[in-house]
Each structure stands twice: as structure tokens, then as C-alpha cells.
Amino acid sequence: EQIDRLVLLRNQLDQYIAQLRLRQAKASQNDIKTATLPAFTGFCREFKNANLAQKTDCLRKTYIEAVKNYKIDNKMRTQCFADDENSGLYIIPVEKQSRGENIKVFHQTQCICIYYRGAYEDFPKIHRRLLDYAKEKGMTPHGYFRNIYMEGPPTHGEDKQSYITQIALPIKFISPAEKK
């Protein structure tokens, strides 16, 4: 239990450090890194064939519903399929012991990721870059992306170039040589 808590804290610190570095970096500096996405419990809603405006509105509604019924534990995120970016899950992390029809447990997984600064409309370009990198390095993706919203409209308003998102491509196996 204590080790799991320390691992979670380490992963959160890694995200915060990356966020601070990205604030200081130029918008074009989007290095691909290996990382471990920690296990968590989430309140989830599916979406299908949704455009960006629909996804934004529904994610906001999902967040409000989660806040009304559960104690929130971390940053909002979406999970979309590699072959269909307009379908997937809205995920609001909640306390580990949460229970309910829309609660799902997500296991820890290795990934390659980019801490991206910019507009949400450009996610498909970042997704393609991660897929190309995985293919080039002989990595096997799980088949979905996880977009973790670190800073967005509540922090930066309409300044889309200042939004910060960790865009992750979970990988089935990353060789020790690829870990940085």
C-alpha cells in the first residue's frame, strides 16, 4: 500500500515537472518520452462519432456528473482508439474505492508520450507522430491514446497555444534499451 502510494506520488511529480519544463520551453519542443501511466479508478462515459466541440461539451458534462457523485482524484482525460479518434471514453479519475455503474479500474501501463503545448485540434498530428515512432522502434501499441488534460481553458482561456496535454500511446512492451 505504501509503495503504491509512493509510486503514484512519483508519477504525479514527473507530470508536474514535465508541465513546468513545458511552460519554459518553446511550443515546438515536443520530445517523445517513455513513461509509466499509473493505475487509477475513473468515472467513464463512452463517446462515438463526436467532433471536437461535441467532445468538449460532453467531457464538461461528464466532469460535472462525476463531481456531484464522487471525490475527484486527478486530471480529466479522454481515451480514444488509434483507428477512430472520434470514439472512446471520457475519464474522470475518482477515489480508488469508488463504486458504481460507470466506474472502471485502469491498470498501470507503460507508454510513449509527448507533453504537448497547443490546440486540441492538432491532437491527430501528435497521435500520428507517436504511432510512427512506435512503428520505427518496433513497439507494439495497445491500440488507443490517452490524452491527459493538464492545463486548458480554465487556466488559459482562449489562448489555445498555451494548453498543455500529456498525449500518451500505451505500449504493450518497451525494451529496457528504449527507456530513458
Task: Give, region by region, the residue ranges found by the protein language model.
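A solvent-exposed interaction/effector surface
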Residues: 4-180
